[in-house]
């Protein structure tokens, strides 16, 4: 019985020790998206056009990691790397929705910031003009959505894929 207790405690210690050392448990799944497409998803030019419309500006070039693409639609910017993988997006007008997996209809630029209260955004910085920068999901994931707000209204949302 004594050996069984030692074995049990050893197994528990092996399972718990990494979390104690690194100060965190396993990462929770975070599904940040723009119009249902999550960063890290491969998207072709034609798929982009069918989802977001024809871009006002499109640039592509070869890099050491494959094809890189930049799309601009209105004031919104999208970057794909490694042959079409969505890495970054910046939403600066109300054409597109983010976080559609978290809420019906998602969230748009121009929406009340209070719609995100249930996600417990963290204040990053307040600016002299009265605007503020918040971050979502920073405490539970490497993926984070940065939200800029003024007078309780969302001004823009930015996602950068963690490298």
Identify the role of each PLM range.
Residues 10-19:
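Bacterial N-terminal signal peptides
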Residues 131-148:
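Low-complexity, intrinsically disordered Gly/Pro/Thr-rich segments
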Residues 1-9:
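Bacterial N-terminal signal peptides that target proteins for export
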Residues 20-129, 149-163:
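Short helix/turn-capping signatures at newly exposed starts of structured segments
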């Amino acid at each position: 019985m004594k050996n069984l207790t030692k074995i049990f405690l050893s197994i528990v210690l092996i399972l718990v020790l990494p979390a104690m050392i690194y100060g965190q448990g396993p990462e929770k799944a975070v599904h940040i998206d723009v119009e249902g497409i999550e960063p890290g998803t491969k998207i072709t030019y034609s798929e982009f056009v069918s989802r977001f419309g024809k871009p006002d500006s499109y640039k592509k070039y070869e890099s050491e990691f494959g094809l890189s693409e930049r799309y601009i639609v209105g004031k919104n910017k999208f970057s794909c790397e490694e042959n079409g993988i969505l890495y970054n997006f910046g939403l600066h007008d109300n054409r597109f929705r983010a976080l559609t997996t978290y809420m019906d209809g998602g969230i748009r630029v121009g929406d009340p910031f209070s719609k995100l209260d249930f996600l417990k955004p963290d204040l990053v910085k307040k600016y002299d003009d009265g605007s503020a920068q918040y971050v979502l999901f920073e405490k539970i994931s490497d993926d984070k959505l940065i939200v800029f707000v003024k007078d309780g209204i969302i001004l823009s949302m930015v996602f950068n894929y963690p490298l």
